[in-house]
Amino acid sequence: MRDRDRLLAAFSKDTGITLKPEQIAMIEAYTGLLLDYNQRVNLTAITDREEIWRKHVLDSLLLFLALEIPPAAKVIDIGTGAGIPGLILKIYRPDLEMALLESQNKKVAFLKKAVATLGLQGIECLWGRAEDIGRQKNYRESFDLAVSRGLAGMNTLAEYCLPFVRVGGFMIAYKGPGGEGELNAAARAIEILGGGTKKVWRGSLTGGQEVRQLIIIQKEHPTPPVYPRRPGLPAKRPLQ
């Protein structure tokens, strides 16, 4: 715990983001549940508690440095896996109306267990593919923000995320040092899908040297009805 507390103190000094004791307790409970489930379901390759804090929890929170999120914003985490970053964002900002979208049912079962265990309200766990859910009236162009971490390249990710975002809203992709290059290569695809203004936030993970880029895209036009294409196509044949 001393290592964790030192890490949190350093993160707070670096970013100005400070977790409350009750939030730390909730994330510790989540971490315990994650490691227990991970013995049966492949949720994370990181099994050291301090590294979970550093590479999953604190990394997720960098979003709040990249973009000001208004109160009670509607947020969807696409390809959330074990709930990263969406679950962490919700714990830090309980006012957010959060949806966690995951295509693997076993992982959705874990997410539902985690949400129930932590007593979180205003959070929905969705089982399905972005290509299908993004066409449903209840979800299409209804979110202020769509986020995704480590799911796909920017061409593909834009087709997964932008159909969920309302005009004027944003998508944010968590990327490493190659993020800006991916963004440049995906410029036309982003424009086709309704994206407009683009920005790159640059930083690094507290306690390490890993470079982090958050790709921020504002949606300026409705996504054409033909997108997203049928399941599998955005990954197999990314828009160019």
From Swiss-Prot:
Subcellular location: Cytoplasm
Stored InterPro entries: rRNA_ssu_MeTfrase_G, SAM-dependent_MTases_sf
Pfam families: GidB (PF02527)
Keywords attached to this entry: Cytoplasm, Methyltransferase, rRNA processing, S-adenosyl-L-methionine, Transferase
Binding site for S-adenosyl-L-methionine: G79, A130, E131, R149
Function description: Specifically methylates the N7 position of a guanine in 16S rRNA.
Designated name of the protein: Ribosomal RNA small subunit methyltransferase G
Protein's organism: Moorella thermoacetica (strain ATCC 39073 / JCM 9320)
Lineage of source species: Bacteria, Bacillati, Bacillota, Clostridia, Moorellales
